[in-house]
Amino acid sequence: MYLILILRHTSIQHFNIKVVSMNHTPVLENQFVRLEPLDIKHGEALVKCIDAELWRGMVTPPPLNVDLMIEYIIGMKSDSAKMPFAVVSRVTNEIVGSTSFYDYAPAQKRIELGSTFYSRDVWGSAVNPSCKLLLCSYAFDQLDVNRLAFRCDSRNERSAGAIKKLG
């Protein structure tokens, strides 16, 4: 069972969001976070973001070592319907997690957000809302989608709660 929230098309340009192109994959940033195209170079830092409670309710097993994380990253990057990002805190300049667009269907003008995880250090901070704002703005203003959905497994109570907090 999935929780799905649909947002209407709105322009969010007054938030001063900067979009920079890098190999046809965007780097998105605001005052709190920078979203960089996910790469195997992020593997070691991302492993440090994983813990058992964080991954509870996810549909895939946790990538608990660098080799498994690199496999996870390669899998995310190999799917043309996904656009995965490493999340970098602009406060600490450290990688604090990952988030993704997926199931992008340009012909239907729809996209989903998910496959998100963050270091426990940033739970409840401005990181998640900042990431979602950047992704929503990019989806509506650059990808020109009409429908955006957040999807999480119903067993993933932490993610469902974080989505509800977005409003």
Report the location of each language-model feature.
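GNAT-family acyltransferases
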Residues: 13-125, 138, 142
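Glycine-rich acyl-CoA binding loop
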Residues: 128
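Alpha-helical, largely C-terminal catalytic domains
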Residues: 135
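Conserved GNAT acetyl-CoA-binding A-motif
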Residues: 141-151
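Conserved active-site alpha-helix within GNAT-family acetyltransferase domains
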Residues: 156-167
